[in-house]
Amino acid sequence: MTTVARVARGGWDVESASTPIANRARIEQVETNVDAPTTPEMLFDSALELRHESGVALRFEAEDALREWVKLGLPAIEVAAAKTWRRSHVERFGDASIAATRDARGGEGVGTSADGADGAALPPGPSMTSWNTTERSAEYDWTFTTPYGGTVTTTSDSNRQPPTWELTDRRIDRAMLTERDPILMYDELTLYESELDDNGVAHLGLKVRVMPKCWFVLLRFWLRVDGVLIRLFETRFFCDFTEVDRTGAVVVVRETQRREETWDALHARGAPCDPTQFPDADQAASVLLAAGGPVDIVTHALTIAP
């Protein structure tokens, strides 16, 4: 059952929809739409949309996030388990590209001698103890890492072009976010998640909060490949209803922080390397922040003319 939350404030109409896991037909449709070889096991049609009275909207959804994953095309992580993971994933969830992969590899694929004499399914992927850097899977980035930063659109009855994100020296007003104002709306959504066949987790989700003077969104992609690396992309969006420039324009600030650490680098700095220490994005963020590793930060502004 779909659960909807909605509030209107400061010229914005904010609406979130939380849905069950998508069915197979919807998953296949997404794979076709974004030209993806597969999708995460848990894919949701949940979405958040923030519509401004000018007709400009900022939307967050799994399909567009996966489209950005395909475009990014990161090289696959070099682990011995990668190919086995992919093939067992295909056995369990399907993969429209398997026929092409089999042909390209001279017949190696599901249902061939590579799987067993009787074409039986492969067992689940190996445990974390088998991860190493001795073999490269060149199929695709099976971690579903996405640089997604939301989708900017305009309503169908608007003749304007969607505004674009521009680099800025503006900052999110964190003091305003800590004020004891009432929370008019709060929601958390999962857009997609994969357990990487018990070898870690990849998760994309968001939190939204609307208050009397502003709204705030935290979009997080986080990845844990056990024994290999931790990756965390955090993108924060903020709009102050009380701030309008001299032209009457409204500004949305987007701050992106990207952190990535190998298991070895964390261990060298004394950080915990037990997967149980990273059960979710909140814990991963705390450990990575405490470890003091490298972080890339960039800030953009979206100016919405009246």
Label every PLM stretch briefly.
Residues 20, 25-27, 63, 234, ...:
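Generic detector of ordered, mature protein regions
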Residues 2-33, 42-43, 76-144, 148-161, ...:
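Anionic, Ser/Thr-rich low-complexity intrinsically disordered regions
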Residues 130-306:
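A eukaryote-biased signal for long
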Residues 61-82:
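Short linear, low-complexity motifs centered on an aromatic residue
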Residues 17, 57-61, 220, 232:
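Residue-level detector of high-confidence beta-strand sites
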Residues 28-65, 207-210:
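Amphipathic, interaction-prone secondary-structure segments
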